[in-house]
Amino acid sequence: MVSVEDITNAVNRYLELVATGTADEIAALYAEDATVEDPVGGGEVHIGRQAIHGFYKNIENIPRATELHTLRVAGHEAAFMFSITVGGDGGKMRIEPIDVMVFNSEGKITSMKAYWSPAYVTTLP
């Protein structure tokens, strides 16, 4: 049984790795048959750890930082709002999604959906 503390720790670890980790490290947080839809309604759903690895590989060499704004855990699920700032000296942008994750009994992410659109993207100087 996964606890509220386990899920809270997993979300914090996820945000830490999205900011500083590799695609391998982020993908390891997911169950083998997990799904990622980011953004929801954006077309492609990444199915399986290998596809999820490919998704996160896209940001691996880009400067980035994350900040958690709010987190709610209920049952085996977490919903959280955070911001991710990506880019470097050539320009930065901040995205403010709300993510919903479902966890299995081992604490692995089985589903992640990110709710955002261009309306939640800010160009930074």
Where are these regions (language model features)?
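Compositionally biased, intrinsically disordered low-complexity segments
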Residues: 10, 14, 43, 55, ...
